[in-house]
């Protein structure tokens, strides 16, 4: 019997979702992206060759896998065509296997201009977006003025809609933000030129998904970013503009709630965050000055914690079970995939946050707002480290006993099994204890 599996990041993103999607998508007929845009970066390492994907589903490296970009994704045609060219330059067949929903909101230069103008105006209080126009594009979608991929199929109507939207956003850019306007004719010409290259990929993605379900075929839904960046459930306002939880797979692709059979929650063995926002277990280290917490330096250096999309330094800290348990509930996680265990290999001891001290009380339920997270002080348990390499370990029993104990403690606190264990960046450096499609 087939399964529909959702892969979700349970922290602030960068948990290692891309590698796991690539790993288990060999069992799937189709891989579906359902939210976000090219602000996400999924890094795959296969036979020591690194591929970074931003829009195209991570199943693209398997020749038999169909890759679907559903209507919950905001689409930059420029970013998509660049990614296609890079993959096809590496002899990977993309255009015959990639399909795009007509409902995908399109990202244009005025979205990027607005994104950057807002961040500049906010100054030190800026959220720290990727500057790719994601937020303004979702705003246009909700305001019902956005242009979608399906509009490209009617160039005359597209041009008319675009003119109206450009006038609106140019008013904002010039009169509120005091920045230069964008050129309608330049945007129109570029968009229609790009449309010629992607129009043949635009199909009813939702119907395609339901055909696979009717045919009893495995489907993998690939989440981007992480639960704590969810527009509704994350550390608002330091969040992204889409629903990054498993519920987003339903609304962002058009399947029903009961169509989902298994949710794999990706958990990094420590915690990272890019950009601004509260981070209770952060071990502050600044790579540019080489000053700060020694453990934070180890996590960032050994873990190569720099954003795949922006190149920015990721902030690092201990594993936070307070936020994770909330994430597991929000996503109805079935099993855990624990990644980057090997980054902890050199540490004498490891810590897990099991509660917060907030307003003089010890709490195990996370606060609802960013200020509460900022005020929260972590309460840790400390466990012995293993000081032995776990990279490429080929069985659970061959792990150091201290590493096994760390994993078992996570399972105990989460009340969930660790079904997959990643012990290195390469596809082969993974222990599958229970396959999500079985």
UniProtKB/Swiss-Prot annotation:
InterPro entries in the record: Adenylosuccin_syn_GTP-bd, Adenylosuccin_syn_Lys_AS, Adenylosuccinate_synth_dom1, Adenylosuccinate_synth_dom2, Adenylosuccinate_synth_dom3, Adenylosuccinate_synthetase, P-loop_NTPase
EC number, as in UniProt: 6.3.4.4
Pathway: Purine metabolism; AMP biosynthesis via de novo pathway; AMP from IMP: step 1/2
Enzyme class: ligase
GO BP: any one term: IMP metabolic process
Binding, IMP: 14-17, 39-42, 130, 144, 225, 240, 312
Keywords carried by this UniProt record: Cytoplasm, GTP-binding, Ligase, Magnesium, Metal-binding, Nucleotide-binding, Purine biosynthesis
Record field: catalytic activity: IMP + L-aspartate + GTP = N(6)-(1,2-dicarboxyethyl)-AMP + GDP + phosphate + 2 H(+)
Main location: cytoplasm
Binding sites annotated in the UniProt record for Mg(2+): 14, 41
Active site as annotated: 14, 42
Protein's name according to its UniProt entry: Adenylosuccinate synthetase
Phylogenetic classification of the source organism: Bacteria, Pseudomonadati, Pseudomonadota, Gammaproteobacteria, Candidatus Pseudothioglobaceae
């Amino acid at each position: 019997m087939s399964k529909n599996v959702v892969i979700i990041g349970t922290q602030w993103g960068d948990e290692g979702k891309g590698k796991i999607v690539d790993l288990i998508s060999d069992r799937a007929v189709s891989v579906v992206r359902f939210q976000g845009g090219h602000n996400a970066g999924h890094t795959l390492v296969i036979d020591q060759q690194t591929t970074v994907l931003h829009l195209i589903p991570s199943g693209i490296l398997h020749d038999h896998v169909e890759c679907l970009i559903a209507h919950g994704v905001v689409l930059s045609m420029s970013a998509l065509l660049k990614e296609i060219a890079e993959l096809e330059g590496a002899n990977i067949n993309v255009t015959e296997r990639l399909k795009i929903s007509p409902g995908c909101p399109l990202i244009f230069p005025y979205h990027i201009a607005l994104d950057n103008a807002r961040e500049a105006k906010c100054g030190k209080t800026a959220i720290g977006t990727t500057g790719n126009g994601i937020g303004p594009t979702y705003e246009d979608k909700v305001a019902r003025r956005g242009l979608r991929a399906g509009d490209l199929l009617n160039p005359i109507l597209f041009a008319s809609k675009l003119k109206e939207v450009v006038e609106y956003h140019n008013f904002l850019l010039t009169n509120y933000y005091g920045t230069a306007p964008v050129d309608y004719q330049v945007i129109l010409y570029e968009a229609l030129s790009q449309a010629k290259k992607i129009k043949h990929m635009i199909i009813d993605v939702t119907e395609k998904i339901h055909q696979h379900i009717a045919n009893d075929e495995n489907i993998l839904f690939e989440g981007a970013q992480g639960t704590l960046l969810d527009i509704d459930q994350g550390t608002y306002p330091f969040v992204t503009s889409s629903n990054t939880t498993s519920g987003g797979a339903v609304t962002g692709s058009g399947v029903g709630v009961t169509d989902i059979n298994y949710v794999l929650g990706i958990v990094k063995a420590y915690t990272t965050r890019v950009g601004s926002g509260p981070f209770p277990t952060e071990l502050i280290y600044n790579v540019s000055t080489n000053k700060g917490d020694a453990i934070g330096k180890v996590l960032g250096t050994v873990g190569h914690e720099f954003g795949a999309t922006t190149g920015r330094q990721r902030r690092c800290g201990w594993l936070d079970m307070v936020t994770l348990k909330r994430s597991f509930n929000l996503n109805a996680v079935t099993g855990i995939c624990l990644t980057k265990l090997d980054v902890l290999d050199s540490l004498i001891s490891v810590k897990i946050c099991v509660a917060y001290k907030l307003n003089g009380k010890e709490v195990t339920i996370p606060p609802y707002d960013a200020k509460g997270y900022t005020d929260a002080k972590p309460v840790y348990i400390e466990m012995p480290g293993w000081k032995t390499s776990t990279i490429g370990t080929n069985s659970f029993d061959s792990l150091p006993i201290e590493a096994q104990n760390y994993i078992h403690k996570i399972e105990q606190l989460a009340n969930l099994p660790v079904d997959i264990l990643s012990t290195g960046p390469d596809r082969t450096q993974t222990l599958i204890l229970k396959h999500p499609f079985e």
